From Swiss-Prot:
The keyword Transit peptide does not apply. InterPro entries: 6-PGluconate_DH-like_C_sf, 6PGD_dom2, Mannitol_1_phos_5_DH, Mannitol_DH, Mannitol_DH_C, Mannitol_DH_CS, Mannitol_DH_N, NAD(P)-bd_dom_sf. Signal peptide: none annotated. GO terms for biological process: mannitol catabolic process. Gene3D superfamilies: N-(1-d-carboxylethyl)-l-norvaline Dehydrogenase, domain 2 (1.10.1040.10), NAD(P)-binding Rossmann-like Domain (3.40.50.720). One of its GO terms (molecular function) is mannitol-1-phosphate 5-dehydrogenase activity. This is Mannitol-1-phosphate 5-dehydrogenase. HAMAP family: Mannitol_dehydrog. GO terms for cellular component: cytosol. SUPFAM superfamilies: 6-phosphogluconate dehydrogenase C-terminal domain-like, NAD(P)-binding Rossmann-fold domains.
Length: 385
């Protein structure tokens, strides 16, 4: 079996690509990074360092190669022979690669390849593959769309593994460090043909419960740790979560978002409390030097209507649940400043150009004046400190 994976960065190599290769699948990495692709083509293997309380080992991932995304014809040619396509490029890049994927599918159809092909976007976004499908279909003819509906599975997934950037090592340019924990859950109802046997890929027919569990817990908690840590001058996530005041606030925020999950999906409260504790422990992993600016980057996206801060807040409003810690986290996200992050710069400009209430409504798309005013009050309190 052969897979084409878009994105040869840390997550691509350290998470999805590793699971595929470990399952005996030949992996072709597609990326614009010339150096990484040349290294993959030459070495056909790379090291992954796995770190945790019980583990600190380097494993070799083999049976891999690379193709340069700048040479679109080479990418398109891959579509005639692969059995699986995956991505780990970031939500903002999905739209960019959709035209290439559409051309690849067209080439596959023209070549007479009628075997089922499944595409899985492994991104930090809700229903990322469905978003990708909509963009891919915008480039296909009606006839190609009909053929794609019959042969191409667009499979939504939820992914969870902390993969921070590591200092470049000239002796091991492909080395990536990952935490021991990983979770990859796919919607089994969306596959075409036989579901591939991939170790570490879990199947479910209730994906949204797991998507929101991860978004409302791991992502919400991670963002909270970063934004509160930034305000107190911490550089790393571990330093932030080791701060007792921040740890207490992060836990309380995840408990508020967790109450929404328990109400919406019937999660067991004790099991979810244990899940929160596991995540707090992951944030404190001493082997992961994860910068708060990496975790807090792109604040406008993280403050958007369906993302990790506003969506759980909306859930508390829907079910009449407590939300004071979520409001404090949102205020701290609004206070995030980083001159090297274009979205952080734009965020600061938006808050200066308009009244705070109007800016918060524009950024979050929240319409309830009462909750917007509470966010504004919390933000103003932060500015005075």
């Amino acid at each position: 079996m052969k897979a084409l994976h878009f994105g040869a960065g840390n997550i691509g190599r350290g998470f999805i690509g590793k699971l595929l290769a470990d399952s005996g699948i030949q992996v072709i990495f597609a990326d614009v990074n010339d150096h990484v692709i040349e290294q993959l083509k030459t070495q056909r293997a790379y090291p992954v360092k796995i770190v945790g309380d019980r583990l600190n080992v380097i494993e070799t991932v083999s049976n891999v190669t690379g193709v340069n995304s700048k040479n679109e014809a080479d990418i398109i040619a891959c579509f005639t022979e692969v059995d699986l396509v995956t991505t780990a490029v970031g939500p903002n890049v999905l739209k960019i690669i959709s035209s290439t994927i559409a051309k690849g599918l067209s080439a596959r159809f023209r070549a007479g390849n009628t075997r089922p092909l499944n595409i899985i976007a492994c991104e930090n976004m809700v229903r990322g593959t469905s978003f990708l499908k909509d963009n891919v279909f915008s480039y296909l003819t009606p006839e190609e769309q009909q053929q794609a509906e019959a042969q191409i599975g667009f499979v939504d997934s939820a992914v969870d593994r902390i993969v921070p950037p590591v200092q470049f090592d000239p002796a091991n340019p492909l080395l990536v460090t990952v935490e021991e924990f990983s979770e990859w859950i796919v919607d089994k109802t969306q596959f075409k043909g036989t579901i591939p046997a991939i170790t570490g890929m879990e199947q479910t027919d209730n994906l949204m419960a797991f998507v929101e569990r991860k978004l409302f817990t791991l992502n919400t908690g991670h963002a909270t740790t970063a934004y509160l840590g930034k305000l107190k001058g911490h550089q790393f996530v571990k330093d932030s979560i080791d701060d007792p005041d921040i740890r207490e606030a992060v836990k309380a925020t995840m408990q508020e978002s967790g109450a929404v999950l328990i109400k919406r999906y019937g999660f067991d409260p004790h099991a979810h409390a244990a899940y929160i504790e596991k995540i707090l422990k992951r944030f404190a992993n001493p082997y992961l030097q994860d910068d708060v600016d990496r975790v807090g980057r792109e604040p406008l996206r993280k403050l958007s209507y369906n993302d990790r801060l506003i969506k759980p807040l909306r859930g508390t409003l829907e079910y009449g649940l407590p939300n004071q810690h979520l409001i404090q986290t949102i205020a701290s996200a609004l206070a995030y400043r980083n001159e090297s992050d274009p979205q952080a710069v734009e965020l600061a400009q938006l808050l200066q150009q308009d009244t705070l209430e109007s800016a918060v409504k524009k950024i979050t798309e929240l319409t309830e004046s009462n909750i917007v005013q509470q966010i504004v009050t919390a933000y103003n309190a932060l500015q005075k400190n």
